[in-house]
């Protein structure tokens, strides 16, 4: 066991720390690793938009490693999965550390739909690394994530250039998930409409996270990871300084 707490009525007497009782006369309960450091489930959204630019790909990988080292540093058991749409694969810790996970996720293909994540456990910490750039009601994902209790956290890498059009006129647009392209004329009014839709999308995610008592932070892809985590993530108490 790794810790102890005071005995409470109804506790299993088999877990009483009798040696401590002999010394102090106080009933205490042994706490084992799973109780002190609950399992951390980390799921990576492996859809192509997470790796759309080198800057965003680097941020995605840095968040994955940050979550790994944070969990291990806390003495918590950790499990990894990568998901794209309704396809999901486990990732070994060694693969995450070495970077070989990037080869493994190629088999997941591309899918622009909201991921289906059946691996969440009822208790412990659940961490989703995803840019949340897919259609659908956030309730679908957060309902499954929050089922059974525990702590739910979303870390969303965000690329500044995704939030607005920097070009007015004809532009070739490419769906990074499907590879489809089209020519679109961007007018000032259309650019403004896009920006409002983008803001509404993430406002809906934030509102739904609050309803489910989940923590969500958007992590800028630009700059160092330490600086990026000192923004929204620190304000939302998704991470804490130690």
Where are these regions (language model features)?
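Intrinsically disordered, low-complexity, positively charged segments
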Residues: 1-5
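Exposed, interaction-prone extracellular/peripheral surfaces
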Residues: 6-11, 20, 29-42, 46-62, ...
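N-terminal juxtadomain amphipathic helix
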Residues: 13-15
